Design a protein with these regions (language model features):
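Soluble catalytic regions of membrane-associated enzymes that act on cell-envelope
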Residues: 212-323
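Membrane-embedded alpha-helical bundles of multi-pass enzymes
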Residues: 2-213
Length: 323
């Protein structure tokens, strides 16, 4: 009988892991904000009931791998575009997803040791641990290669944006994890506790959607005209000097079409500049284009300033880098 129960628990945990990983991925990929508030509840429920640390490691790897396979799916067509074999591309995605899933071991390890302290301690530890790892991922990315994009708060970009002014993305992440961890822990607890959490969550979620509506519907006294240019530069031509003039000509054509339209801000795609913005010739060419439009430009470019990074530069109508 105990074997049957153990197998049933394993199947249940696997289903919960699958549900959480797929739901969270849908929240990111298809902008389904509400899933950001619900996706982790089954996962946290499984974690809360585990008494062996090796199972925490298994859950971490399983959830992380399944989530990142979906979140980083674009790596396969990107590698294929570069001539990499389909099987090698799939292997690269699987290996990267397994590596990325390591972060969840660090997230779930600390709450495991706080499980016996009850709902408040476990939920607060889970929220703190998750938020800390999100913060560290961004800091680590300044010195090493990692993927810090998937902050839980990003799933709420259409709803909780006004609140980031007060608490930042880390505050949003903390609240979302705290809510879901509390729900998961309280499923088998007293009904009064569950009711309080549900009422509080309904208040937070409804107020976030209301604030979005109020902010978006508030008339603005000042209007600006924004243009977005898209030169569609082939990445494999990007660093080939034989195509340098061709890329410049395409960008010049796009900029020329904006000259008489009184644009206030021109936004370039990430890394669209044909070369390094630090190079004197490239920057001089860029300044001429900026002055033609008499507008501010946000330009994405690789830069040697403080290391080699892709950065966004705000350039004034006079051709000076402001930020």
């Amino acid at each position: 009988m105990s074997d049957i129960k153990e197998k049933a628990n394993k199947i249940k945990n696997i289903l919960f892991i699958l549900f959480s990983a797929i739901s969270l991925s849908i929240s990111y990929n298809f902008n389904v904000s509400i899933l950001g508030w619900l996706a982790l509840i089954p996962l946290f429920y499984s974690l809360k009931n585990e008494t062996k640390f090796k199972k925490i490691i298994f859950i971490s790897f399983s959830f992380g791998s399944i989530f990142y396979i979906q979140a980083l799916y674009w790596i396969i067509p990107t590698l294929q575009a570069g001539g990499v074999n389909i099987f090698l591309s799939i292997f690269a995605l699987l290996l990267l997803s397994l590596t990325m899933s390591l972060e969840f071991i660090f997230i779930f390890a600390l709450p495991f040791y706080f499980n016996h302290f009850g709902c408040p301690a476990w939920s607060l530890t889970m929220a703190s641990s998750w938020t800390l790892i999100e913060f560290l991922k961004i800091q680590i990315n300044k010195f090493a290669v990692w993927f810090p994009w998937f902050s839980l708060a990003y799933t709420q970009n259409n709803n909780l944006m006004p609140y980031t002014y007060y608490v930042g993305i880390y505050g949003i992440t903390f609240i979302m994890v705290l809510f879901q961890a509390s729900i998961a822990y309280s499923i088998e607890e007293r009904k009064k506790t569950m009711l309080k959490i549900i009422l509080f969550s309904l208040f937070v979620i409804s107020s976030s959607y209301l604030s979005k509506k109020l902010v978006l519907n508030s008339p603005s006294q000042e209007k600006i005209k924004i243009a977005i240019i898209q030169p569609s530069v082939d990445y494999y031509k990007k660093w080939d000097l034989n195509y340098f003039n061709e890329i410049k000509k395409d960008i010049e054509t796009l900029i020329s079409s904006l000259e008489d339209k009184r644009i206030d801000l021109v936004i370039w795609p990430e890394n669209a500049l044909p070369g390094w913005i630090d190079d004197k010739d490239v920057f001089s060419w860029l300044v001429k284009l900026v002055k033609k439009t008499k507008a501010y430009h946000i330009v994405g470019s690789v830069s040697r300033i403080d290391g080699k990074h892709v950065s966004a530069f705000l350039i004034s109508p006079d051709g000076e880098i402001i930020q």
